[in-house]
Amino acid sequence: MPSYLSPGVYVEEVASGSRPIEGVGTSVAAFVGLAPTGPLNEPTLVTNWSQYVAAFGEFTQGYYLAHSVYGFFNNGGSAAYVVRVGGSRQGEGADATSPAAVKAAGTPAALPPGEPQKLGTFTVAAVGSGDLSVEVADAEGDGPEERFKLIVKDGRKTVESFDVTAKKGQRAYVVTQVQERSRLITVAEAAPGAQLARPENQTVVLKASAPATPGADPVASHPGPAEYLGDSADRTGFGGLEAVDEISTVAVPDLMAAYQRGAIDLEAVKAVQLGLIAHCELMGDRVAVIDPPPGMNARQIRVWRQETAGYDSKYAALYYPWIKSFDPSSGQTRLIPPSGHIAGVWARNDFERGVHKAPANEVVRGAVDLETQITRGEQDLLNPIGVNCIRAFPGRGIRVWGARTLSSDPAWRYLNIRRYFNYLEESILLGTQWVVFEPNDHALWARIRRNVSAFLVNEWRSGALFGQRPEEAYYVKCDEETNPPESVDVGRVICEIGIAPVKPAEFVIFRLAQFSSGNGELEE
């Protein structure tokens, strides 16, 4: 206490006994991908689209990072860390808005087509490198005679496959489908529209287009799994994100661009996605948004989810199918992986409703169409295995229609439960830092109980916890039972917290019965 030696009035500041816990943010995303310029392997914060363009350049044809970041901000995201992997350090420190950078941003993947080959009333040409061939085969199942399957192979490996039709104006028209989905070939009409017909079953070998400059091969520019995984000591790849605490969502949209170009196969895709999931599990405060391979129907994605990928994690969520969005680099609509838009939907949902609300039944802004229209019967097969579907509803737009993790544990089935626990854990962790080195006695235990309870009662009042009274929604225990003498002697203070989170109304069931007034209920 201070000493008072002379008469007078003294004012003392007394610390308040209450130290309120504040909720942390849950809407900061991280994107790992390719860009024509910008810092290499350095997490860079951008808070709007203009900042991204200044640091990493505009939309780049054939890559998805810029589209994903744009979709994130368009759907309500406010802050994101971007990690540029692959490429060279030549563009580091350059002004991405300079004429040279803008020119480079629009063309690194846009190689001139190779020599076109005849394919019936169509022509096909290669835009990628490698020993490419195109095979025309019969379509699966019954259907009109103009239907066929177009298979693109790099050597003996199938790298792209399209179920198409030769009938112009149809959704599956071969020219439109290849233009929107292929990164390796282009198809053009070689006859008037009335004369277009299904090509005969055949295989044609394509001559790859030559890179415009030495080393400009787009496949070579794609990083391998090791570059994505990175190293925490060197702060590269996913390892570089370990130093950024505020990240809550992670996506790797350009992984599928590398797969489409044949730079990596599905085994490498799985290795990177497993590394992404492992990173989120290691950090314990973020969730991975997984993109499926393109061009898969509901049956194929079910097989891929269960047999090929087989992921089982409460820190990851899978969304299907790909969405169609406008591509300013080509002036046309393009299919892009949904992870960037989904991360924005999560951020918007957290801001408008709270992280405790499942990020589903939300409109995907910027999506003009879907790669595949999913029926209710198909979703009946996909939803139980953790595939969150994106569906188009008449008069309601394109919406996220699933909110599950990839976990087989029923306790962590719902995505909002996992993300809400991340929010609580991080908030309590940061809000109780003052406890360290305080005297470990009953007074400290009471202060901890009071502060944590004050935080949780506000969560209950906001509708995040289940129960009609606070006692039914949570409990906080920090006393002699949780802190016996042997625990106190080693410098530990243990607080036990239990909560009852609100789970989403995933299945809304109305039971209707017919009854006659005065005569009771009528049964069928």
Give the predicted meaning of each segment.
Residues N48, G169-R171, G224-P225, G230:
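A diffuse structural propensity rather than consistent per-protein peaks
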Residues Q195-D234:
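Long, low-complexity, polar/charged, intrinsically disordered or flexibly structured peripheral segments
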Residues M1-T97, P108-S129, G141-E145, I151-T158, ...:
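Structured, hydrophobic secondary-structure cores that serve as assembly/anchoring elements
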Residues T97-A100, G106, K118-A197:
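Extended, Lys/Arg-rich, non-catalytic nucleic-acid recognition/anchoring regions
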